[in-house]
């Protein structure tokens, strides 16, 4: 049998054992770690870098005419202005600042989605549905993205952006959104 070819292994037999962890940066925004792990076959791998950040919400919002509400903003990581759905961090009520939180309550996530939609776009909705919750980057991060749909959004205010947010609201017809998605 080849190494790593047992796809029917039990989850316990696939788990890595943490040998050591050093917190390289730990502040209100991120916990960046360097760790050593023992693999299921007994071999040791190091360094393995990982991080914790806050869970966040992404809102697939559409207005009363069926247009999608998006925001355009500069993203430092890729050095580009992007068009994306409104999104933002979940302010946790359990005292933790970030990380590992499939424990975040559905109410906390929905409250964050409502808050972020209003802050970033000035829009609100009475028609919300939870789409899914997924790991943001399961290879190296322990936070989750909670995706919501907000339908029939209506503008009730201007933007109320955080001091580090500089973004513009754009509305995109469904056909234009499909073209953007096809382009990646």
Language-model-derived ranges and their functions:
Residues 1-26:
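Extreme N-terminal tail/first-helix region
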